[in-house]
Amino acid sequence: MNFETYFKISYGLYIVTTQSGDKKGGYIANTLFQVTATPPQFAISCNKDNYTADLIKQSGVFGFSVLSEKANPALIGNFGYKSGRDFDKFAGVNYFTGKLGVPIVTDSSVAWFECKVNQSYEVGTHIIFIGEAIDNGLIDEKGKSLSYNYYREVLKGYSPKNAPTYIDKEKIEAITNTVKQQAEVWQCQLCHYEYEAVKGDPISGIAPGTSFLDLPNDWVCPICGADKSMFEKE
């Protein structure tokens, strides 16, 4: 199997959210797509172990925010690499409550939808929820939607382990070893973000050419917020 072929499939990046009672949930999704035009229906694939999956089953509703190409990586890390069971992902995040009672995130987003679940299917490790769009809106009419390819190539992020598109990092490393041998690359062991000295970290104001060892002691991963001790040299 050539695992590089999986990265040729195009995806967007979204924050899928829901609420059941007083419990809110949300996660980063790239497997989300429109399946019918009339009525407008969308499918999402959610890991069975995700806290949000339980809340969607309870509430029967979900919403999603279409992330901007200029999305704050910390927001992606917040919803993508932490569990809502023991962490309030919505603290400090701008959102509003939609018609169906779904918390809709507006930060770093260009548009949003709110859906009522019509069907669901169990597919191995994941559940596919199909929901009819009940309401939607634009947040940034001129903003560009964030693609997974941009997230991976520019922001150096990877799918978390529970994502349906997750590929074991050892298989990815086999593809990228040649490039890594030519540059200083340090990888976050939590989210697999890669710090490349030749590029620096423009998000945190780190200039290109800055060695990882010369980074400030308070520097953290721009994706998941892990400190320097969580990085290993590739």
Features from the language model and the residues they span:
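Short linker/helix segments within small regulatory modules
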Residues: I203-D218
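Residue-level detector of conserved, well-ordered beta-strand and adjacent loop positions
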Residues: T17, E196, P216
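Basic, polyanion-binding surface patches
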Residues: M1-Q181
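Short, charged low-complexity linear segments at domain edges
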Residues: Y158-E173, Q189-A207
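Short metal-coordination and nucleic-acid-contact micro-motifs, chiefly zinc-binding Cys/His arrays
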Residues: Q182-E184, N217-D218
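Short, non-ligating residues that shape and space the ligands of small metal-coordination modules
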Residues: A197-V198, S229-K233
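Short cysteine-rich clusters marking metal-coordination/redox-active sites
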Residues: C188-C191, C221-C224
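Cys/His-rich finger/ribbon microdomains and the adjacent scaffold used
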Residues: L213, I223-S229
